[in-house]
Amino acid sequence: MPNVTIARESPLQDAVVQLIEELDRYLGDLYPAESNHLLDLQTLAKPDIRFLVARRSGTVVGCGAIAIDTEGGYGEVKRMFVQPTARGGQIGRRLLERIEDEARAAGLSALLLETGVYQATRIALYRKQGFADRGPFGPYGPDPLSLFMEKPL
């Protein structure tokens, strides 16, 4: 298997911008706009976001981020995505583990997330990694197309 690295990088690189555009198209095909809670590239580049890039043999194949809520003491998992051609190699799991490491290093007590109900593989990964269902949090309201999850750290 080719070498996979995961590191904090800028989301403003051309290859990452293309990956985020691919993610936006994917989510746009699954959910209506009001059920897509996406952080834009400029927000992903802010200091309270830890943006991670997965590379396989140097090529961008995935990403994930943690948005730090210092008032709430938690981090929110955002923008988790692995290109379809790179799936099956544990890259998503490794990204999520690195996000957990970043959250612990920031002194956060929990990771929270919102994901879409039609993403069974992603939901299974979150559950396998110890996330449990919970109600809406932060800026979110109830949405039949959203699933909210939490993992204490």
Curated annotation (Swiss-Prot):
Q: Does the keyword Cell cycle apply?
A: no
Per its record, how is this protein called by name? IAA acetyltransferase
Q: Name one GO molecular function term.
A: acyltransferase activity, transferring groups other than amino-acyl groups
Report the superkingdom from the record. Bacteria
Enzyme Commission no: 2.3.1.-
N-acetyltransferase domain mapped to chain residues: 4-153
Record organism? Azospirillum brasilense
Note whether Endoplasmic reticulum occurs among the keywords: no
Family matches, as InterPro entries = Acyl_CoA_acyltransferase (IPR016181), Bact_Acetyltransf (IPR050832), GNAT_dom (IPR000182)
What keywords tag this UniProt record?
Acyltransferase, Transferase
- Free-text function comment from the UniProt entry: Participates in the tryptophan-dependent indole-3-acetic acid production, which is a phytohormone released by A.brasilense.
